[in-house]
C-alpha cells in the first residue's frame, strides 16, 4: 500500500468545448478561458474583493494553462512566461452521454454512463400528471407550485411567499436529469423536505431521473436565501465504482461535501458535510491530517457551479477560483512522501454562455505530489483514466473495467 490520494473536483470548471459540444448547443464554450478574458478586459472587478486579470499562480504552476491551451487550441496566454508545470497535466474528454454531475463523477470513478438519462420537457407543467398526483398523495400535500424549468434562486423569489402561505412545496427542473424541491426551512420544515424528497426519489425512478434535490431556503419575501442544507438523492451507479472497490479492500474513503450524495452513499466509509468552498477546503485539510495510508479523500467544490456557473456570475466565479488557488499551498504542506493530489472537474458551466445550464467541455487533469515529476499526459479519452490512475497508485488488487492509467 502506497501513499494516499486526494481528489479535488472543481465542479463545472471546464477548459474548452468537446468535439461533440454542438450536439448539446455548447459549441465554443470555455469556462476558464472566457473568465480569463473577461477579467483581462476589466469586466470582473468587485470593489474591495478582486480587480484586474485572473490570478491563479498555484494552478498555473501545476499546469492549468498548459492543459487549457492543449484542450482548446486557444493562445490566450504566453506559455513562455510560465514556469514548467510541477506535476502531471492534461485534459480529459467525457464519454458519458450527459453533461451532468453524476455522469462526470461516476465516469471519473470508472463507470461511464452509457445510457440516456430521462429529462422533463421545457414547457409549463413539465412533469407527468401521474407523477405529480402520486407525489401529492403519498406526501399528503395540499398541492405543489412551479412545475417548470427554472433557476432555483429566481423561482424561490417568485413563489416563496405563496409557498409559505399555502404549504405547497415548489417543484421544478432544469436541462439536467433532476427533480428539484424547494421549501422554507422554518415554515415547511427541513426534515419534512427531506422526507418528501425520499418519496420523490422512488417515484421518479421509472422516468430514469438522475437526482432528486432538496433545495431548502430561509428568509422573508424579498430576501429569500438558499441554505447549505441541500441534499441530493441520486440513483445508484449502475456498476461498482472505484469507491466500492476501495471500501471492499478495507480502505478509508472520505467523502466531503456532496460526494456521498452523488454516489448514493455507496463505497463511502466517512461523510463530512461543509457549506461553501472555503469550508470544504478546511474540511479537506482536516481529513488529510488524519487520513491513513492507502485512503482516498474526495471533495466536490460545488460553489463554482451552483453559485457562479449556473447564475452566470463571471466575477464571482473568478473570485472563487482565486480563493481556491490561494489555499493550495496549505494542502501541499500536508502531503506525505507518496501522496498524490488530483484536480479535475465533472463538466463545464461557462458563465458567459446564454441560459443557465451546464456546458459540454473537456476537464483539466492536474496531478501533483512530492514524488510527481513534470509530465504532459495529453488528451485522455475518458474521465475514467483518472480513476484507473488512482487505482494503480493505491495498488488495488485488480484494475477498473474502464480507463487507462497515465502514471
From Swiss-Prot:
Enzyme class: isomerase
Signal peptide boundaries: none
A single GO cellular-component term on record: cytosol
Keyword Transport recorded: no
Database matches in SUPFAM superfamilies: Alkaline phosphatase-like, DeoB insert domain-like
Alphabetically ordered keywords of this record: Cytoplasm, Isomerase, Manganese, Metal-binding
Co-factor binding details: Binds 2 manganese ions.
EC numbers for this chain: 5.4.2.7
Sequence positions that bind Mn(2+) 2: 305, 310, 358
Binding site for Mn(2+) 1: 11, 346-347
Cofactor(s) listed in the protein's UniProt record: Mn(2+)
Cellular location(s): Cytoplasm
Domain of life: Bacteria
Keyword Isomerase: yes
Family indicated by similarity: Belongs to the phosphopentomutase family.
Biological role: Isomerase that catalyzes the conversion of deoxy-ribose 1-phosphate (dRib-1-P) and ribose 1-phosphate (Rib-1-P) to deoxy-ribose 5-phosphate (dRib-5-P) and ribose 5-phosphate (Rib-5-P), respectively.
Protein name: Phosphopentomutase
Organism: Legionella pneumophila subsp. pneumophila (strain Philadelphia 1 / ATCC 33152 / DSM 7513)
Classification lineage: Bacteria, Pseudomonadati, Pseudomonadota, Gammaproteobacteria, Legionellales
Amino acid at each position: 500500500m502506497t501513499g494516499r490520494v486526494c481528489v479535488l473536483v472543481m465542479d463545472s470548471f471546464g477548459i474548452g468545448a468537446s468535439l461533440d459540444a454542438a450536439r448539446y448547443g455548447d459549441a465554443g464554450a470555455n469556462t476558464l478561458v472566457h473568465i480569463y478574458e473577461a477579467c483581462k478586459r476589466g469586466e470582473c472587478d468587485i470593489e474591495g474583493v478582486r480587480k484586474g486579470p485572473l490570478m491563479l499562480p498555484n494552478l498555473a504552476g501545476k499546469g492549468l494553462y498548459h492543459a487549457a491551451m492543449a484542450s482548446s487550441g486557444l493562445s490566450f496566454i504566453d506559455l513562455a512566461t510560465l514556469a514548467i508545470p510541477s506535476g502531471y497535466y492534461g485534459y480529459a474528454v467525457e464519454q458519458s452521454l450527459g453533461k451532468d454531475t453524476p455522469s462526470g463523477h461516476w465516469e471519473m470513478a470508472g463507470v461511464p454512463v452509457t445510457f440516456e438519462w430521462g429529462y422533463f420537457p421545457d414547457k409549463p407543467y413539465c412533469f407527468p400528471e401521474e407523477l405529480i398526483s402520486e407525489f401529492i398523495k403519498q406526501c399528503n400535500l395540499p398541492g405543489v407550485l412551479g412545475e417548470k424549468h427554472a433557476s432555483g434562486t429566481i423561482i424561490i423569489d417568485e413563489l416563496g411567499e405563496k409557498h409559505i402561505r399555502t404549504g405547497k412545496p415548489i417543484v421544478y427542473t432544469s436541462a439536467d436529469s433532476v427533480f428539484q424541491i424547494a421549501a422554507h426551512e422554518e415554515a415547511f420544515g427541513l426534515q419534512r423536505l427531506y422526507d418528501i424528497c425520499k418519496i420523490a426519489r422512488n417515484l421518479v425512478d421509472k422516468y430514469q431521473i438522475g437526482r432528486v434535490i432538496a433545495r431548502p431556503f430561509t428568509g422573508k419575501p424579498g430576501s429569500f436565501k438558499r441554505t447549505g442544507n441541500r441534499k441530493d438523492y441520486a440513483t445508484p451507479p449502475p456498476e461498482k465504482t472505484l469507491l466500492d472497490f476501495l471500501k471492499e479492500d478495507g480502505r478509508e474513503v472520505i467523502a466531503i461535501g456532496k460526494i456521498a450524495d452523488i454516489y448514493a452513499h455507496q463505497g463511502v466509509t466517512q461523510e463530512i458535510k461543509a457549506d461553501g468552498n472555503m469550508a470544504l477546503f478546511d474540511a479537506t485539510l482536516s481529513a488529510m491530517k488524519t487520513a491513513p495510508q492507502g485512503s482516498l479523500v474526495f471533495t466536490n467544490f460545488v460553489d463554482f457551479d451552483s453559485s457562479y456557473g449556473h447564475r452566470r456570475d463571471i466575477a464571482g466565479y473568478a473570485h472563487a477560483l482565486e480563493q481556491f488557488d490561494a489555499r493550495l499551498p496549505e494542502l501541499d504542506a500536508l502531503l506525505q512522501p507518496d501522496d498524490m493530489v488530483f484536480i479535475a472537474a465533472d463538466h463545464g458551466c461557462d458563465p458567459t454562455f446564454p441560459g443557465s445550464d451546464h456546458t459540454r467541455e473537456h476537464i483539466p487533469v492536474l496531478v501533483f505530489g512530492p514524488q510527481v515529476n513534470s509530465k504532459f499526459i495529453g488528451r485522455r479519452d475518458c474521465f475514467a483514466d483518472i480513476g484507473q490512475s488512482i487505482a494503480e497508485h493505491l495498488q488495488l488488487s485488480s484494475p477498473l473495467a474502464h480507463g487507462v492509467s497515465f502514471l
